[in-house]
Amino acid sequence: MSHIRLTQVLIHNNPSSFNSPFIFDISFECVSPIKEDLEWKVIYVGSADNEKNDQVLDSILLGPVAVGQNQFVFEVDPPDANKIPKDDLLGVTVVFLICAYKGEDFIRVGYYVNNDYFEQELKDNPPETPDLSKIQRNVMDDKPVVTGFPIQWN
């Protein structure tokens, strides 16, 4: 049985410009005492074709964690567009919110992300070099994919 139960994740600042931070408002319940900190991280998938294009946007340790309801806001920088293949900058990708205990991932929340131009003219005729200031990021927060993994807690 998991000692931590994710109860809610709200994504603020959505939709937003590509260069805006991701802001996750995370609520979880600690149902049994844990001795170590929780590690939370956000990973942006830069290309479905190559895992080396994935970017860890940020990682934090949270603790000590009290038994009961807990909540915090996790704000992370946007991905570095220079590390994303030009052909993968627009369209659908994924961002993961992951929580680990003692180095073992026990929950992963995946969200589809659609990056597209604000303006119809740019959608119809995208520039040769992507203009990040005109790209909108829309996290599909109504349909997260939540995966739990069994781990050794203590």
UniProtKB/Swiss-Prot annotation:
- The source's domain of life comes to Eukaryota
Q: List, alphabetically, the InterPro entries matched.
A: ASF1-like, ASF1-like_sf
> Which Pfam families has this protein been placed in?
ASF1_hist_chap
Q: Which family does it belong to?
A: Belongs to the ASF1 family.
Question: What GO cellular component entries does it have?
Answer: chromatin; nucleus
Q: Which UniProt keywords apply?
A: Chaperone, Chromatin regulator, Nucleus, Transcription, Transcription regulation
Q: Which GO terms describe its biological process?
A: DNA replication-dependent chromatin assembly; nucleosome assembly
GO MF annotations in UniProt: histone binding
What is the name attached to this protein's record? Histone chaperone asf1
Which gene name does the record give? asf1
Specify whether Chaperone is a keyword of the entry: yes
PANTHER family in alphabetical order? ANTI-SILENCING PROTEIN 1, HISTONE CHAPERONE ASF1
* Function statement: Histone chaperone that facilitates histone deposition and histone exchange and removal during nucleosome assembly and disassembly. Cooperates with chromatin assembly factor 1 (CAF-1) to promote replication-dependent chromatin assembly.
Instruction: From the Swiss-Prot or TrEMBL record, state where the protein is found.
Output: Nucleus
